[in-house]
């Protein structure tokens, strides 16, 4: 029926154009569903449909003249007039996927007191049947077809392809859109909706469909209703001028940011943040970071990185912060972020956000600043008298000594002039200059090197390779360990190892307390002479300075005793191995034959040692009150350390002793 009506309207338009000679520039009405017609039949938007009085029945003219209209029409010919505009309030555009009706479009005068009203139009100056076509167009001129659809549950047959069409009988002059609502097309469905309108040639204002390829520029939440009418003139249908309603605003759910898990991030970006919000579409939402100047102009912006799958139930977004325009900032920068809906450009209220410097770059920056500060301070001090290079003292009450240099050359052998024949092997090596002093024989060491007082030396015939395991000399105790052969009896100062010992230590031999000093010494097996524990100067022949590691006196007698006892060792003990026997130390002291001169250097270098030696010497030279009876072997042993022995007198004494025993000596 609608197609037949459209054919009648086209015939009416063509006939009127022939009568008027094409003055009106007629054409076909674009917008009738399924209508044919040549493409050159186009009506201008400002041209009303020609209504020929000869074509209008007389009773219709009288009816129009006598009918009382609510508002008199300013136009004399048939036309459409809007009685009730759609509401200016925001309404909800329903999606098809919601599974419910889109509701209805309230009118401008709708209220709780007066009741609900709906958009209403009226056909003026025409009493015949009228076909009304309603579609959605954009809110801005030129009025192009809008992709949203008009739908109705009760009048499903009247709503096809997103448009609403209805035929008004002659007794009805008004059309009320009471059960018609607006269905929101998805972003992916918008182009298909416009292609369907283009196919059916629904374009009241002949604005073309070029916008079907620019979906992003279409405001999804604002549109208008376009009313178009077709009247019957005789056997023809004539279209009336289309009109549009006031804009209808859809409820584009207000974008609101409820909460952010963090309001700061590094300048490098990439920090993950979760935002809580209200009712967002995962395919139509952006999180925008931006910065403004003092005048409020936007100087920088960047969108956060997230996918539609990062939107959780239209209530939360997990996104990554974008990189700030300057990643080498040294101070925090305050920016703002907001939600943006690309389809309609709606935005949320902005929230403050902070970009802070990267920790690695901040550390490097602080170091550079500190280095520059120090250099600047140095340059400032150079121009003053506080710089160290300018603080030179011309005089001082303290004497400046140079740091002693450590000798790096090979030590050279230096021998005292008084000791050229006392070293059959080599001479001791030392670096420092030595004092002039008398030489003496050193029987403590087996080599020509200077032995240390911190080591003890094994017997010449002992199998010991070292005696490092022997406990060091202890100067704080009054005990001495003495080990003597059975057939020997001589005066000594020190401890001696067993002649038949094959061990590396003498700790296993039972000690015996015999004296006031504590030294470990080892007597050669075939020697019978008094010896001293160790040379206080570490080597024989002279020294630079005696060594005192324990800060105690390391010698038992004075220097004269050392020299005299060593130079008087001329006796040879009998051959053979003897058993070990513990005896009492002989207290008789014999004066040496040779008394060397005192060494002033030692006295000056170590006055405490000399003083201690002077205190010890009188005590050692005092003879004891009780002297034990000497045997024949003791008599022979007691001759050690005396002047050269008169052999003839000794032989006479031996013969006299043998005669007294009744033994005839052999001659």
Curated annotation (Swiss-Prot):
GO terms for cellular component: cytoplasm; cytosol; nucleoplasm; nucleus. It comes from the Eukaryota. The keyword Lipoprotein does not apply. One of its GO terms (biological process) is immune response. Residues 78-372 form the RHD domain. SMART domains: IPT. Its main location: cytoplasm. Signal peptide: none annotated. PROSITE patterns: REL_1 (PS01204), REL_2 (PS50254). InterPro entries: Dif, Ig-like_fold, Ig_E-set, IPT_dom, NFkB/Dor, p53-like_TF_DNA-bd_sf, RHD_CS, RHD_dimer. The gene is Dif. Changing residue 181 to D: In Dif1; immune response defective. Reduced survival following infection with fungi, and reduced levels of Drs following immune challenge with fungi or bacteria. No down-regulation of the serpin Spn27A in response to bacterial infection. Keywords: Activator, Cytoplasm, DNA-binding, Nucleus, Phosphoprotein, Transcription, Transcription regulation. This is Dorsal-related immunity factor Dif. GO terms for molecular function: DNA-binding transcription activator activity, RNA polymerase II-specific; DNA-binding transcription factor activity; DNA-binding transcription factor activity, RNA polymerase II-specific; RNA polymerase II cis-regulatory region sequence-specific DNA binding; RNA polymerase II transcription regulatory region sequence-specific DNA binding.
């Amino acid at each position: 029926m609608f197609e037949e009506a459209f054919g009648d309207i086209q015939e009416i338009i063509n006939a009127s154009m022939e009568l008027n000679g094409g003055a009106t520039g007629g054409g076909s009405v674009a917008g009738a569903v399924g209508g044919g017609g040549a493409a050159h039949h186009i009506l201008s938007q400002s041209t009303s449909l020609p209504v020929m009085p000869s074509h209008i029945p007389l009773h219709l003219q009288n009816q129009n003249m006598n009918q009382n209209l609510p508002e008199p029409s300013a136009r004399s010919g048939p036309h459409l007039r809007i009685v009730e505009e759609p509401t200016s309030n925001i309404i909800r555009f329903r999606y098809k996927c919601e599974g419910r009706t889109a509701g209805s479009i309230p009118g401008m005068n709708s209220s709780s007191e007066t009741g609900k009203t709906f958009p209403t139009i009226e056909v003026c100056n025409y009493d015949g049947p009228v076909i009304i076509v309603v579609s959605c167009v954009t809110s801005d001129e030129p009025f192009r077809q809008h992709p949203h659809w008009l739908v109705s549950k009760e009048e499903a047959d009247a709503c096809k392809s997103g448009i609403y069409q209805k035929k008004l009988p002659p007794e009805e002059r008004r059309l009320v859109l009471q059960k018609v609502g607006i269905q929101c097309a998805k972003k992916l469905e918008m182009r298909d909706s416009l292609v369907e309108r283009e196919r059916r040639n629904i374009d009241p204002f002949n604005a073309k469909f070029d916008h079907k390829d620019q979906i992003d520029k279409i405001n999804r939440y604002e549109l208008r209703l376009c009313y178009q009418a077709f009247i019957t003139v005789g056997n023809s249908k004539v279209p009336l001028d289309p009109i549009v309603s006031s804009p209808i605003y859809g409820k584009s759910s207000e974008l609101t940011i409820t909460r952010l898990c963090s309001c700061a991030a590094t300048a490098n970006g990439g920090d993950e943040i979760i935002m809580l919000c209200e009712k967002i579409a995962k395919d139509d939402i952006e999180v925008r970071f931006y910065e403004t100047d003092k005048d409020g102009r936007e100087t920088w912006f960047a969108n956060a990185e997230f996918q539609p799958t990062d939107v959780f139930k239209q209530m939360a977004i997990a996104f990554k912060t974008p990189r700030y325009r300057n990643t080498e900032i040294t101070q925090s920068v305050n920016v703002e972020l907001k939600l943006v809906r690309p389809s309609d450009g709606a935005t949320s209220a902005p929230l403050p956000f902070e970009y802070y410097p990267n920790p690695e770059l901040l550390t490097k920056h602080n170091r550079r600043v500190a280095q520059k500060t120090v250099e600047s301070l140095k340059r400032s001090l150079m121009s003053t008298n506080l710089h160290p290079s300018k603080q030179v003292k011309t005089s001082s009450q303290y004497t400046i000594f140079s740091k002693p240099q450590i000798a790096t050359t090979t030590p050279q052998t230096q021998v005292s002039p008084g000791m050229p024949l006392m070293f059959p092997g080599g001479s001791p090596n030392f670096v420092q200059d030595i004092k002039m002093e008398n030489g003496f024989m050193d029987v403590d060491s087996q080599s020509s090197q200077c032995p240390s007082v911190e080591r003890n030396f094994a017997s010449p015939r002992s199998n010991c390779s070292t005696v490092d395991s022997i406990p060091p000399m202890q100067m704080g105790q009054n005990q001495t360990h003495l080990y003597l052969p059975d057939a020997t009896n001589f005066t000594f100062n020190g401890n001696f190892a067993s002649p038949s010992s094959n061990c590396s230590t003498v700790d296993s031999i039972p000690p015996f307390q015999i004296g006031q000093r504590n030294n470990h010494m080892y007597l050669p097996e075939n020697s019978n002479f008094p010896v001293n524990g160790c040379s206080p100067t570490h080597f024989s022949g002279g020294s630079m300075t005696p060594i005192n590691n324990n800060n105690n006196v390391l010698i038992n007698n004075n220097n004269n005793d050392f020299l005299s006892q060593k130079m008087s060792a001329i006796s040879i003990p009998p051959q053979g191995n003897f058993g070990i026997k513990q005896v009492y130390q002989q207290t008789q002291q014999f004066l040496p034959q040779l008394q060397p001169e005192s060494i002033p250097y030692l006295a000056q270098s170590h006055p405490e040692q000399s003083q201690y030696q002077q205190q010890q010497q009188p005590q050692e030279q005092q003879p004891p009150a009780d002297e034990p009876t000497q045997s024949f072997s003791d008599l022979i042993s007691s001759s050690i350390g005396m002047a050269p022995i008169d052999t003839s007198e000794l032989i006479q004494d031996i013969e006299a002793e043998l005669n007294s025993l009744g033994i005839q000596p052999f001659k």
